[in-house]
Each structure stands twice: as C-alpha cells, then as structure tokens.
C-alpha cells in the first residue's frame, strides 16, 4: 500500500488541532453522561454552532483515516460497517446495558452468559464489535464495563431509537437495491413501495405496518421518535406565538396526540388549537378548553377554513415530493390569503458539496428515504417544492431559535401572495 502524502497528513493534523481549540472554546467543559441524559429528557440541546464544530472534527478525523487506511481497506471498512450495527442490535436486544454494571467493578462474561442464556463465544464477539466502536469496554479479559456511549442506552428513547436504526432501518437498507430495480430509480408518489415495504410487507408503508401488523415495533418507533423530538428546538423557541392576535386558531396538522399543542397552549393561553390526525392516533384523547382533537387525513382537503396558522412539525420529511405537494395543496385550498399562514417546522439541509456535509444529517435523510420514501430538504429544495404547490405560495420568513440563525432547523413561514 502506498503511503499517504506527508504534506496532506500534516496539513490535516494541523487543521484538526485548530478545530479542537475552537470547539473547546465554544463548548466549554465536557458534559458527563448524566448531563447528556438530563439534556435529552429536559428537551435542552447544544447549540447548532457547537454541533457544526463537532462534526468538522469528525469529518477531519475521517479524512485522516481514509488516507492512512488506503483506498481498498477504507472501502471495505465502509462496506462492512453494517456489522457494527448487527453487534449493537444484538446488544440492545439482550439489554446488555442493564446487565453490565455501572460501577467501580466490571461485569464478568460469566455473569452476562447467566443473565442472557447466550453462549460465551457469541457474547464475546458481540461485545468485541461494540467495544471497537467505544460502546462498552473490555477492561480485562472477559471483564466488561460501561463507556459514556453505552450508558446512554439506559435512556428509554435512545435505546428505542438505536433498536429501530439497527432493525427496521438496516433491513430496509438491505432492500434498497431491489427497490431501485423495481421502481427503475423513480421515487413513488407516496410511501409504498419503499425499501421498508420490500423488507417487511410489500402492501404496507411503515405507519400502516405498525398500526395493523406489528404494534411492538410501532411502540418502539414511537419511543424512539420521542427521543429525537427532544433533540430538536421547540417550535415556540423559534416562532413567536405571542405575535398572534387574541383568539387566533392554530391547526396542528398531523399533530399526533396533541402534546405540542397542549404545551404551547399553556404558554400562550390567548390561542385556540385544533389537533388533526387519524382516528386511531387521537382515539381516547380528551379535548381541553384550548385544544380540540379532530379526525383528519392529510390526503384530504383540510376542513378548517381560514385558520390563522396551519402548523406542520416534522411531517413533510416523511413523504416524497409528490405527496408533499398533495398535502400542502389540501391546506392551500383552506387558507384565507388575508391572514392564513403555513408554518413548516422542519430540518433545513445546508447547500454544501457532498463531502463537506454533516454525515449525521445525511444519515437522517437516508433513514427517511429507506423507511418512508421521505426526504430532508435544503433551502433550494424547499423553495422548489413550495413553488410547485401553488404559484402564489411563497416563503415569507424563516424563524430560527435565537442565536442560531441559518442553522439546520427552522420554521418556514409560508403565505399566499394577495
């Protein structure tokens, strides 16, 4: 194997050193796992600037790794990275995070065998695969302890999200090539067929599959999405609900069981909220003085006409462009051009060259592609989609969390030109 350029390696090492200095100046002291758990459960998140600087460091480390590995080992290492997910899937399935003690003394392999019933040989290999990715640590032969990462598996939402990623997402990924062949590389107009449907049930999309076939995976998905929800800025941290007139109506389209609307209504009691979702989703949820539950399918024209706000939080990324045009068109027909606005509370992908983008954001994008035919969109892609819906519809403003203007998450405010 040819050695990498000395100048290239030294240049990257110097870049890495400067990036670490900038990150430490921004991030301050490193948080403990307990702080991270508190951050997730209290819905407080690090700043977007801190995230961006962290991912710059990761990207530089990857570039160094690609050079010192050489092209073929680097290529094969990436091709086999699903084996890391397989080991992590087994670890979460066996609940090793609860069996391995978090304390001064490690947990023996014999103890783990007794708790799981799995052979020494298989457990040793599962834990080796995890430990190589700094998830658990073998501190002595057949003696295992927690790392900061493995401790996070004790957080219910994170455990569920990892399980979903190592199960549904990984199996959907294995069907991606078959999906491309079947669809001739053209995305369907809705959620079926998809790589997920090819892996699990050719007649059902993810949400339909969960509700009619596999409620166990469905419950895990809900818990996992709760974990991701806590890492996003709150909509009220971005959009100024106090600016709406007394008695304004906010329609929470696809709002689930109304958690968002109830929370915002407590902070802004001058507003009235209508939460719309499918009957099975809102079943059993009681109305309150400020929040009304309403059965509605986003594929049908919206029955609430002339509302002040139609809010969609993390809805459109679950659907391909054609479906999003249909969903938004069903809202546009209900809007009053003199006062109605649509608020799209979604990720906004940066317009960057592929190699300069954040890997984690790309992984989120590929997750919705594989499971839902969905799409995370850049500003350019959002504008193209919005223009396709209706020539009068335009982005009037993007609301950001204070101090994070231009970050990867914002609320796009759409209005109809009069």
Swiss-Prot record:
Protein origin, superkingdom: Eukaryota
Q: Summarize where substrate binds, as residue positions.
A: 170-176
Which UniProt key words apply to this protein?
Cytoplasm, Methyltransferase, S-adenosyl-L-methionine, Transferase, Vacuole, Zymogen
Per the record, pH dependence is: Optimum pH is 7-9.4.
Q: Fetch the SUPFAM superfamilies from UniProt.
A: S-adenosyl-L-methionine-dependent methyltransferases, Winged helix' DNA-binding domain
Where is the region Substrate binding?
Answer: 206-225
Protein's UniProt keywords contain Transport: no
**SS bonds (residue pairs):** none
Catalytic reactions on record? sterigmatocystin + S-adenosyl-L-methionine = 8-O-methylsterigmatocystin + S-adenosyl-L-homocysteine + H(+); dihydrosterigmatocystin + S-adenosyl-L-methionine = 8-O-methyldihydrosterigmatocystin + S-adenosyl-L-homocysteine + H(+)
In the record, biological process GO terms are:
aflatoxin biosynthetic process; methylation
Q: Part of which pathway?
A: Mycotoxin biosynthesis; aflatoxin biosynthesis
Report the subcellular localization: Cytoplasm; Vacuole
UniProt-recorded name of the protein: Sterigmatocystin 8-O-methyltransferase
Gene source species: Aspergillus parasiticus (strain ATCC 56775 / NRRL 5862 / SRRC 143 / SU-1)
Q: Which gene encodes it?
A: aflP
